[in-house]
Curated annotation (Swiss-Prot):
Disulphide-bridged cysteine pairs: none
Cofactor(s), by name: pyridoxal 5'-phosphate
Chain positions with N6-(pyridoxal phosphate)lysine modification: 214
UniProt organism field: Rhodococcus jostii (strain RHA1)
Tree of life domain: Bacteria
Protein family membership: Belongs to the class-II pyridoxal-phosphate-dependent aminotransferase family.
SUPFAM superfamilies in alphabetical order: PLP-dependent transferases
Cited InterPro entries: Aminotrans_II_pyridoxalP_BS (IPR001917), Aminotransferase_I/II_large (IPR004839), ArAT (IPR024892), HisP_aminotrans (IPR005861), HistidinolP_aminotransfase (IPR050106), PyrdxlP-dep_Trfase (IPR015424), PyrdxlP-dep_Trfase_major (IPR015421), PyrdxlP-dep_Trfase_small (IPR015422)
Name of the protein described by the UniProt record: Aromatic amino acid aminotransferase
Pfam families referenced in this protein's UniProt entry, alphabetically: Aminotran_1_2
NCBIfam families: hisC (TIGR01141), PRK03321.1 (NF002878)
Keyword tags: Aminotransferase, Pyridoxal phosphate, Transferase
């Protein structure tokens, strides 16, 4: 006889991270190719020297630095072990068994996982034909059991982004007792007019999630944050796992904020490469939604798995999404060229069932 665990865990999908193989070019996990700045590495080393001490569970210095950086009050900020942990904490803080969490699909793969782990019911709303959020359908999906709505902007994995006007109309139509999480993990790559922090102001049912994993290059350290009404922040602290944001992560995040100008300037290069890669794929006959993130998406349908497998054989790792599509991280120019060499080949176009445009 084995110990009993929750029977419903059998129905919960496992989160599948991007793969990695020695010597391969990894364009599967939306990581930045550039490491931390010297000042950030120094902060990491200094914090590691005191690893025998517990971290600050209140994240006081980090929250103060974030408040100054964002122009919000400290009581509006909660920190977490990556923004994905805050996603789960939001579900735990808002939902009882059987309550509903709405999100677009496809969107961030963790949403159905964290929803079901908390005993809530995921409500998946299909994307539009152009691979963006169907906000009207999401509004129509709201019931008296809806407690939380995730809006991933830009959307992962499709890269599509909503405008300020679209989000304002949506947020103003959501009932005041339903929390809306604007998940802005890729905010720093988005050149549209939508800024979750500005949308949060004056809307107590809006929470903004951001991370240091992407543009700040701290994916391996795990630190993210939420900006929310003080009542929501208090609820998050009650479900937060003690000491989850370690001292090294807090120190690295503070140092990264101090160097944010230099770090965020790197995103301009990613945005330029994103356009170059997308233009080349369009010229090769692919459908490529316009992306506002550090990746592009190919909606290849049933051809997705074979395309990603062939790319791996060619030495470039991508992220397939079942029978929906393939996501390609924007790497450095040489990495992107390696992917484009594969994608524009006769073999790849045949696998993807695309033809060269006239």
């Amino acid at each position: 006889m084995t110990p009993r665990t929750r029977a419903d865990l059998e129905t919960i999908p496992a989160y599948i991270p991007g793969k990695n193989f020695p010597g391969a070019i990894k364009l599967a996990s939306n990581e930045t190719t550039l490491g931390p700045l010297p000042s950030v590495r120094d902060a990491i080393a200094d914090a590691a020297a005191n690893a025998n001490r517990y971290p600050d569970n209140g994240h006081v210095a980090l929250i103060a630095a974030l408040a100054d950086h964002l122009g919000v009050a400290t009581e509006n900020i909660a920190a977490g072990c990556g923004s994905v942990s805050l996603c789960q904490e939001l579900v735990q803080a808002t939902c009882n068994d059987g309550d509903e969490v709405i999100f677009a699909w496809r969107s961030f793969e963790a949403y159905p996982v964290v929803t079901q782990v908390a005993g809530a019911t995921p409500v998946k709303v299909p994307l539009t034909a152009d691979h963006g959020h169907d906000l009207d359908a999401m509004l129509a999906a709201i019931t008296d059991r809806t407690r939380l709505i995730f809006v991933c902007n830009p959307n992962n994995p499709t890269g599509t982004a909503l405008t300020k006007a679209e989000l304002e109309r949506f947020l103003d139509a959501v009932p005041a007792d339903v929390l809306v999480a604007l998940d802005e993990a890729y905010f720093e790559y988005n050149r549209s007019d939508a800024d979750g922090i500005e949308l949060f102001r004056g809307r107590p049912n809006v929470v903004v999630l951001r991370t240091f994993s992407k543009a700040y290059g701290l994916a391996g350290i795990r630190v993210g944050y939420a900006v929310a009404d003080p009542a929501v922040v208090t609820a998050l602290t009650k479900v937060h796992i003690a000491f989850a944001v370690n001292a090294v992560a807090q120190a690295a995040a503070i140092a990264s904020l101090a160097a944010s100008g230099e770090l965020l300037a790197r995103t301009d290069g990613v945005v330029a490469e994103r356009k170059r890669v997308r233009d080349a794929l369009l010229a090769a006959g692919y459908e490529v939604p316009e992306s506002a993130a550090n990746f592009v998406y190919l909606p290849l349908g049933a051809h997705s798995g074979a395309f990603a497998a062939a790319s791996a054989e060619a030495g470039v790792l991508l992220r397939p999404y079942g029978d929906d599509g393939v996501r390609i991280t924007i790497g450095d120019p040489a990495e992107n060229d390696a992917f484009l060499a594969f994608a524009t080949s006769t073999e790849a176009r045949s696998l993807a069932n695309v033809a060269v445009r006239a």
